[in-house]
């Protein structure tokens, strides 16, 4: 079989499966519990958190694990909105975002008073940077754009979006 949807779901690398097997069969304990296999689970999570933090130049306590991309997207948008709503209520995203982003933006509009601007894309799915830049207001607290579209393969100009956010808004928060 030839599999052409790696942008959406990729087969797990064999070395990852091998590294994870003990936690599916031997050390499957709840890391918040006090029994021995729980301690092994907690050790692995702590070590993984430290390794990821080191790669990202972050502190281990700044690393959170979620069940997947949709949960992460929901959390990023809702948490950012709640944390910065005293500075503004405007979010910018694109019309072609993943439903996890679009539905969360709709929720924030209807339930939390957010103002969301959905900027367009060109025929290749690339965000219209002029439209994005024009959408920035003093109330803008977040720009959320997917780095690469899993359906059409478009790679967005993330560095340019970050530059625009910092230059015009001074908040500089972007969710990619």
Task: Name each model feature, range by range.
Residues 1-173:
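Pyridoxal 5′-phosphate
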């Amino acid at each position: 079989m030839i599999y052409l949807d790696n942008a959406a779901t990729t087969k797990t690398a064999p070395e990852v499966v091998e590294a994870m097997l003990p936690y599916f069969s031997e050390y499957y304990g709840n890391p918040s519990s006090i029994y021995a296999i729980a301690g092994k689970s907690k050790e692995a999570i702590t070590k993984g958190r430290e390794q990821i933090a080191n790669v990202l130049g972050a502190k281990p306590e700044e690393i959170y694990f979620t069940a997947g991309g949709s949960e992460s997207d929901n959390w990023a948008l809702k948490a950012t909105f709640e944390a910065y709503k005293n500075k503004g209520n405007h979010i910018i995203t694109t019309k072609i975002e993943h439903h996890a982003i679009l539905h969360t933006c709709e929720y924030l509009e209807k339930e939390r008073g957010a103002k969301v601007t959905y900027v367009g894309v060109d025929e290749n799915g690339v965000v219209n940077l002029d439209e994005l830049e024009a959408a920035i207001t003093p109330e803008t607290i977040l720009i959320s754009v997917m780095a690469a579209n899993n359906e059409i393969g478009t790679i967005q100009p993330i560095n340019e979006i970050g530059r625009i956010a910092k230059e015009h808004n001074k908040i500089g928060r972007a969710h990619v």
